[in-house]
Amino acid sequence: MSITAQSVYRDTGNFFRNQFMTILLVSLLCAFITVVLGHVFSPSDAQLAQLNDGVPVSGSSGLFDLVQNMSPEQQQILLQASAASTFSGLIGNAILAGGVILIIQLVSAGQRVSALRAIGASAPILPKLFILIFLTTLLVQIGIMLVVVPGIIMAILLALAPVMLVQDKMGVFASIRSSMRLTWANMRLVAPAVLSWLLAKTLLLLFASSFAALTPEIGAVLANTLSNLISAILLIYLFRLYMLIRQ
């Protein structure tokens, strides 16, 4: 059977419209979890204020020089802030991926679904999803640090891994290997969707500061919710595409 991107886009749009409120609630819950965890594990405001003390920002030629000019205590604060942001983001993304994929599975099986039920049903697979998303994020970031393009290619090749892990109950490394093989064979169908997702995320990042006009916390929740909705659309597309490829 010939698969066209247009038909998968149409199916994705229909599913997203029909399940919008459930997907929105999952996205909002994941955004709230991300922001709360980030706040809990981040350094205090007083500690963050120390990062500006005695650091010659104007004289630093890059991030590496800036970090070198920091005191050991400031470096520890920066490391804690980075770790808190990364950890909370990974947790939120794992719950989002599990919740959205479970919504699709439950709806496809003709069952009624709610945001809490979808997240609860995804609980057994969340540890594996967390490890998978951590590894894929690490690979993509390493690729972006090299020359950007390798990171984008890795993001495309690994896109189907979460769907395979949940739908076929694969292991973490098996889903990574299978995703790379299957995506490479169907690059024309996967690449445009992933590139559109990356572009949408980049545009959202550029305008993220405007959300802080309300309060930093509410702005962070709104920005994360929109980011989660964008990711949810991609997950729906990838799930539908994967099911068609398997037929």
Swiss-Prot record:
Compartment(s) where it occurs, according to its Swiss-Prot or TrEMBL record: Cell inner membrane
InterPro entries in the record: UPF0259
Parts of the chain that traverse the membrane: 20-40, 87-107, 118-140, 152-172, 187-209, 225-245
Periplasmic side stretches: 41-86, 141-151, 210-224
Domain of life: Bacteria
One Pfam family, short name: UPF0259
Entry keywords, A to Z: Cell inner membrane, Cell membrane, Membrane, Transmembrane, Transmembrane helix
Topology in the lipid bilayer: Multi-pass membrane protein
Principal location listed in the UniProt entry: membrane
One GO term describing the cellular component: plasma membrane
Regions of this protein lying in the Cytoplasmic compartment: 1-19, 108-117, 173-186, 246-247
HAMAP family named among the record's database cross-references: UPF0259
Family statement: Belongs to the UPF0259 family.
Protein name, UniProt field: UPF0259 membrane protein YciC
Organism: Escherichia coli O157:H7
Gene: yciC
